Amino acid sequence: HPNLYKNGKVCLSILNTWNGDSWTGCQTISSVLLTIQSIFTNNPLINEPGITHIHKDFYDYTEIIRFKNIVVSTLAVVNNSDKRYSNFQHLVKIARDDFLNNFENKIGIFEISKKEYELFKNNNKTKEITCSIYKMSCKIDYITVKSLFKLVKEKILLLDIDKN
């Protein structure tokens, strides 16, 4: 997200980190948290100053974020393939249960994302897209990721059988 940084900083005008409505004494922690919550949208780049839907990299940025969210937040966590999640096993279990219980819905969302990407790019081939904003690039391959979704589901089901 363009307003959230790896080091934990949050860029919001009400925190005096950018031009715009700045901090006043009448604001509370609730108003700050509500502002932070409001920036979580399907198009986070729209929160960047000077960026609109017609910016040349708007769609590419959005597509990279959408695809990486599928890969990282779903597959990496549910597959538990990253050691960084070792301290969060109780949350990984919740994510796995959600993944299994909502698998068909997730595949449906995945298919919608794939179709939107294909319409935008006028093809269905694997393609690397780049975005000058933040110098991002990503190889978009929904076909492979869909296969990975199915493999991860099978792996989880096998692990659950082994535990019982």
What is each model feature region?
Residues 1-44:
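E2/UBC-UEV (E2-variant) core
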